[in-house]
Design a protein with these regions (language model features):
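Short alpha-helical segments enriched in small residues
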Residues: 1-163
């Protein structure tokens, strides 16, 4: 995997050159994905906003994610992450959206998944999703690994569209 600084610069270069925008919904990373995107000079030309709907109760207000929206989707599934990404993209009116849902730990087995489990969805000109398992139960370490994985997936998808 590329170094995170290189990935962030690559994302910024592509988005700026194509005049495209991105928004983020993240739960277990607590803003780390958004912070990474904002850390690059020029971020105001591509970063529209991010939300951290950590409590389920705010997802409806912030993203129009309701029980009916996700009825039939398994928690922590790639389909669930894609639903969040698509709603984020639509709600924030961006070209791209990144959604991350995860269990950072150290407590376990939420929805039957162990700490270190995460799903990422990318919605945009091309969509992609991934299930990530770190095998770790250290909260801060998982948060950073989830962030890096989400940004790497986004950079890969952007590159595929670029070529």
């Amino acid at each position: 995997m590329e170094e995170s600084t290189d990935i962030l610069l690559k994302i910024a270069r592509i988005l700026i050159s194509r005049k495209e925008t991105v928004s983020v919904t993240e739960t277990s990373t607590g803003g780390l994905i958004s912070a990474g995107l904002l850390s690059v000079p020029g971020a105001s030309s591509y970063f529209v906003g991010g939300v951290i709907p950590y409590a389920r109760s705010v997802r409806g207000d912030l993203l129009d994610i309701t029980k009916d929206t996700v009825d039939g989707l398994s928690p922590m599934s790639e389909e669930m992450a894609m639903s969040f990404a698509q709603n984020t993209k639509q709600k924030m009116q961006t070209d791209w959206a990144i959604a991350e849902l995860g269990i950072a730990g150290p407590g376990g087995a939420v929805y039957g998944f162990e700490p270190g489990s995460c799903v990422v969805g990318i919605a945009g000109l091309r969509s992609s999703s991934a299930f990530i398992q770190t095998g770790k139960d250290l909260r801060n370490e998982n948060m950073a690994l989830f962030r890096n994985s989400a940004l790497a997936l986004f950079a890969d998808v952007l590159s595929e569209v670029e070529s």
